[in-house]
Amino acid sequence: MLLTARTPSRYASALGALSVFMAALLLPLCFTGGVMTTPAIQQSLGGSPAALSWLTNGFMLTFGSFLLAAGVTADAIDRKRIFIAGAALFCLSSLLFCLTHNLFLSGVLRALQGLAAAMILASGSAALAQLYDGAQRTRAFSILGTVFGIGLAFGPLLIGFMIDAVGWRGVYALFALLSAGVLLIGLVSLPAAEKSEPRTPNNLGLTLFTLALMLFTASLMVIPARGFLSLTTLALLIASGGLFVAFVVRCRRVNNPVLELTLLRHPRFVGVLLLPVATCCCYVVLLIIVPLHFMGGEGMSESQSALYLMALTTPMLVFPSVAALLTRWFSPGQVSTAGLMMASAGLLLLGDAFHSNHLPQLVLALILCGAGAALPWGLMDGLAISAVPVAKAGMAAGLFNTVRVAGEGIALAVVSAVLTASNTLTLQSRVHGYAPEVIHRAAGWLGAGNMPQAAALLPDFSLRVLRESYDSAYTLLFSGLAVVTLLCALMIWLTLCRKGGAIQTRNSGS
């Protein structure tokens, strides 16, 4: 695994790469850790489903909203400074999370972790690119992707066993320890930015975009607790819409826009932007709701649920390489479309498995979803860059990553709203003698995958009624996710695979 550095100090560069690799391991651990620790935190600190959801929502809200701003700032100022600042913020917020006894403060600290993650992700890849050239750079980024995949595949298992052994506070102590290592190693080994012409970022454009995206995502996140037509939801939607309009106007009027809107005139690039939307529906969303189902709906421990979740995550270690091999004979668009169709079948099978409570079928469905999503996963970044002119590749990559991460937060908010709404409608039609707010709270717990809490609110009704509501909500959700994934696959086929739209790639006959 030795890499030849482009800088005079080979070992300093190797240490710098190590800090980036450690960060690549930390981010997926933190993402899945927020989910796996939620039931334990609820038992320790209490809280409603809406309050507990911010342990995940808070992280995704700031992670997605600040990613573009962090990347632009890193390019304009110094990638090392942004990377180190992000690691320091991550370490501090994780350490404070270990000590907190307040759920609201926990949500705030998770939001700070999301901001720190955006800073680390946006600057880490660029910092790694400074260390190596040519084939060695390719190898370094291959290792980076592998480490990220390992964190995603085995992170839930590690965290599940840690919760069983030392509790949720020990998990966040591990995050603090890892981020401290990233901070110290990166501080002494990453090279400072090379002197170049100073660039002033479009601060107003970045602010408008970040606030618009944050308010829009927040408006979706409050729907389960407030309702779609509530004053809070509508105010957030209107404010985000106004900010998006102002952002578009700003982009049209300045010479150095945050985003060149002409990128969206490239049909292939629009098709590529649908890839993270599809993989979010058939993979990332499942990383959240499946372990919550295992722990709250099936009564499994954290470590048991993590073992079953590996059916979803393990294919991510293997199938990206399979996808790269398949591009010798098929175009990336064709491979991606086939993978999404496989994942759609897995989602439909998953809905039936939830309803029938057939565990082997559920495991098979998770494998199909994981393998199907993994096929386009390793091809997406290259497709994003190749779908636009070379001069706009950097901006295209920035927009693509923003859509990927922000889309995950938006999708999770929509999923939560759908599950809560479906359970609310079912319970309102079948449960009588309880106040509407009690029924809504029970529906919220069912939407969060917590059957015991819902049953405690409705003690006069059998678990069978709650289970039927729970199962029908998930069946509806998985059917909807399958439809969205299939529609994305169709659009990707039309934009990337049809004659005149396919992105050229080397095949076996070339």
Task: Give the location of each predicted region.
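C-terminal membrane-cytosol helix-exit motif in multi-pass small-molecule transporters
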Residues: 176-195, 210-222, 239-253, 489-496
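Cytoplasmic loop-to-transmembrane helix junctions
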Residues: 51, 136-143, 392-399, 473
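Helix-loop-helix hairpins in multi-pass membrane proteins, especially solute transporters
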Residues: 67-205
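12-transmembrane solute porter fold
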Residues: 15-30, 34-36, 49, 204-206, ...
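Hydrophobic transmembrane architecture of multi-pass small-molecule transporters
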Residues: 404-494, 509-510
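Extracellular/periplasmic helix-loop-helix junction of adjacent transmembrane segments
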Residues: 37-65, 303-307
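Central cavity-lining transmembrane alpha-helices of secondary-active solute carriers
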Residues: 57-71, 125, 310-322
